[in-house]
Regions:
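A solvent-exposed interaction/effector surface
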Residues: 2-5, 15-182
């Protein structure tokens, strides 16, 4: 029994270290307004889809359903639009630098983004519509208060596997017109 408890304790302590191996899309925090971060994101490669079974289609792509039959590491975050009809995976930096293979699956596309400024607000736990709405409202109110103009629609970002139970990271984000004087 003592060995079982020790083994379980070791596994639980190690889980955050294992989770840290996931590559996170790089960004630089430029400024903070309360709980809202203004960030600079360099160019990145996304693989996007829409129209149902979005996660499955993107997972098939990184599992080898692409022109090179190349397996690609899962990264974070996963991007979703407000009604969850569109989803995108960020490609690892190495794939971005060499170029992502073309998808074989229908309704899956590779997109290279331009560098951009965004405003983001982070929250924990499992996400749901109530949390998303509250954080979207807080994000947009903070931007308005600080005279920062949002560009386009908000995006919802998930960083964790559904099997991660604690220290979960979610964000609501929107591209902004950024002026360093504000």
């Amino acid at each position: 029994m003592k060995t079982l408890i020790h083994t379980l304790f070791t596994i639980l302590i190690s889980m955050p270290l294992i989770a840290q191996d996931t590559e996170i899309q790089p960004y630089e925090v430029i400024k903070k307004h309360d709980s809202v971060e203004i960030r600079y994101y360099p160019s990145a490669t996304l693989v996007k889809t829409s129209g149902g079974n979005n996660f499955g289609k993107l997972f098939q792509y990184i599992s080898g359903n692409n022109e090179n039959s190349e397996k690609i590491a899962m990264t974070a975050p996963v991007y979703m639009n407000e009604d969850k009809s569109e989803m995108a995976f960020v490609m690892p930096l190495e794939v971005h630098q060499k170029g992502a293979p073309e998808p074989k699956g229908k309704n899956v596309a590779v997109e290279v983004t331009k560098p951009r400024y965004v405003a983001a607000i982070r929250y924990g736990g499992y996400t749901n519509a109530t949390k998303e709405t509250a954080h979207k409202k807080q994000l947009l109110e903070t931007l308005s208060t600080n005279g920062i103009e949002p560009l386009g629609e908000v995006e919802y970002l998930g960083y964790d596997s559904p099997y991660k139970f604690y220290n979960r990271r979610n964000e609501v984000m929107v591209e902004v017109r950024y002026d360093s004087e504000k």
